[in-house]
Amino acid sequence: MKELLEKILRGIVKHPEEVVVMEFDEEGKKVYEIVVNEEDVGQVIGKDGRTIKSLKILLSALMGDSKEITIKVVR
């Protein structure tokens, strides 16, 4: 999933070479921390958080299990 998320993010940002995704488990949740160029933060979050919410929904559907997903954008 980490690789898929990186590929999607690289397709929507202006600085794809700076995209870094870290994946880990925290308190029974799957957590993805995203590091992008400061100029790309708004693009990743989207208007009213729509882009980041869509990414979360997509990953949840692909994982197909009951594990909750959290996506954090780190600067």
From Swiss-Prot:
Coiled-coil region: none
Every KH domain range: 29-75
InterPro entries with a match to the protein in the record: KH_dom-like_a/b, KH_sf_prok-type, KhpA
Domain of life of the source: Bacteria
Location of the protein in the cell: Cytoplasm
SUPFAM superfamilies (UniProt xref): Prokaryotic type KH domain (KH-domain type II)
Record's keyword terms, sorted: Cell shape, Cell wall biogenesis/degradation, Chaperone, Cytoplasm, RNA-binding
GO cellular component terms listed in the entry, alphabetical order: cytoplasm
Keyword Cell wall biogenesis/degradation found: yes
GO biological process, one term: peptidoglycan biosynthetic process
GO molecular function, one term: RNA binding
Keyword match Cell wall biogenesis/degradation: yes
PANTHER family in the record: RNA-BINDING PROTEIN KHPA (PTHR34654:SF1), UPF0109 PROTEIN SCO5592 (PTHR34654)
UniProt xrefs under HAMAP family: KhpA
Similarity section: Belongs to the KhpA RNA-binding protein family.
Function according to Swiss-Prot or TrEMBL: A probable RNA chaperone. Forms a complex with KhpB which binds to cellular RNA and controls its expression. Plays a role in peptidoglycan (PG) homeostasis and cell length regulation.
Quaternary structure note: Forms a complex with KhpB.
Protein name per the record: RNA-binding protein KhpA
Gene from which the chain derives: khpA
